[in-house]
Design a protein with these regions (language model features):
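An ectodomain-focused feature that recognizes extracytoplasmic/extracellular
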Residues: 31-110
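Bacterial N-terminal signal peptides that target proteins for export
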Residues: 6-18
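Edge beta-strand at a domain terminus
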Residues: 96, 137, 152-197
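Acidic, glycine-rich flexible loop segments
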Residues: 109-167
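Long terminal segments
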Residues: 34-51, 180-198
Length: 198
């Protein structure tokens, strides 16, 4: 069936705004390398629901939305838009490579870095460039990837400074909004949670 990246009309205005923020502010994979060519994003997906838990360094943070994205090179991200009235660019991303599908209804992504974006970061093309913190962890996405009716996303990671990151996100039952962009490169594509979606 056709896929759409537009939030449906039943979504709350805050979710629609968060989706727009995430679409515009996709993570840029660079710190000091602002001039490096960035890999193209080929999949963007957003779940409608709520954060049951989102903690950074043991501190609870309110989140507006959670999105999944994947680049042509295979790197995947779970990006959280934080509900911060003082900073609409406050975004934290669990980023990793070599995602896997241990069974049909589970996608696991080993995390090797956290991307931390805020209004105080240096900018490229007018958007904040995230700070990159090497980390170890895992994200797990559960649900029916064919119908896009996902159940939950859970992520845990610890960066090199010992700071912990934890996400527990629960779907409200609305099918995910997915945007798929045609690959430009040849070769075998990386494993995606949406490989079965046509």
């Amino acid at each position: 069936r056709p896929m759409s990246y537009h939030p449906n009309m039943t979504q709350r205005p805050s979710q629609a705004l968060a989706l727009a923020t995430l679409l515009i502010a996709m993570p840029a994979f660079a710190s000091d390398e602002l001039q490096r060519q960035q890999p193209d994003t080929i999949i963007f997906a957003m779940m409608s629901g709520k954060c049951r838990t989102f903690k950074v360094g043991g501190r609870d943070l309110p989140c507006r939305a959670v999105a999944f994205s994947q680049t042509e090179e295979g790197r995947a991200n779970f990006t959280i838009a934080i509900n911060d009235p003082k900073d609409d660019s406050h975004i934290i991303t669990f980023s990793g490579d070599n995602g896997r599908r241990p069974d049909a209804n589970v996608y696991e992504l080993p995390i090797d870095r956290m991307l931390l974006k805020s209004k105080d970061r240096p900018k490229a093309d007018g958007l904040p460039v995230p700070a990159i913190e090497p980390a170890t962890g895992l994200c797990r996405q559960v649900g029916n990837f064919v119908t896009l009716e996902l159940t939950s996303i859970s992520c845990t990671a610890v960066d090199r400074n010992g700071k912990s990151y934890e996400l527990q996100y629960q779907s409200d039952g609305t099918p995910m909004a997915v945007r798929r962009i045609k690959r430009k490169r040849v070769g075998s594509p990386a494993v995606s949670p949406f490989d079965d979606v046509k």
